[in-house]
Amino acid sequence: MDLSGKIALVTGASRGIGAATAQALAKAGAHVIVTGRDAKALEGVEQAIHEAGGTATIAPMDLLESDAIARLAEAVAGRWGRLDVLVINAGILPTLMPVVDIDQKALGKAVSTHLLATQALLGSFDPLLRKSEAGRVIGLTTSVATRPRAYWGAYAATKAAQEVLLDCYAQEVANISKVKVAIVNPGATRTAMRAKAYPGEDPKSVKEPSVVADAVVALLDGDFPSPHRMSVN
């Protein structure tokens, strides 16, 4: 797999699937812009990438901060003039509870993270993705977005909305650009979010984030119909 010369941006890259994907992209030759709220964790990801022979730029930021995404897009445009890969991975898991008891503040944060930030990312980076020879958007999703489960209402509803937004965007750009969109369900993966949802689960019983990361890179190495949906087993 060769992504040499590609410019990639990964949100939620400080740990878990985001960090693993950033490292896999860099290993394949891409220069990776890693974003997240935890600057120290991002520095660790950057160091791991450099030690493996790759290159990266850290961009600590809060996706919910006003104009933060637009400012990042301006910086990327000024330095590279395009974006080849946008991996939308950042997410939060509200406390699992009945729909009638969902905390409005927590729901609002999930809406902002999964829906509003996704729209802002697409809106700000679309011009740069179109300047790529083969712009790609990868959105990480969850099985409960299409197969809802009791007590998962806040997370499932906002991730489902995110999927719809990505699907609509894919259709809108299909015939007027080379940009393509893939929605990837990582399945059961050893992450902090998974541990929060399933505190009694043996972490060794589920796959490591690197498995998902490798699947994403393999997807980017070829072509695919858009919108494309993929599950990682």
Language-model segments: residues:
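Conserved glycine-rich cofactor-binding loop
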Residues: 7, 14-16, 38
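Rossmann-fold scaffold of SDR-type NAD(P)-dependent oxidoreductases
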Residues: 11, 83-91, 114, 139, ...
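Conserved mid-core segment of classical short-chain dehydrogenase/reductases
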Residues: 70, 93-108, 151
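Catalytic Tyr-X3-Lys loop
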Residues: 100-119, 138, 162
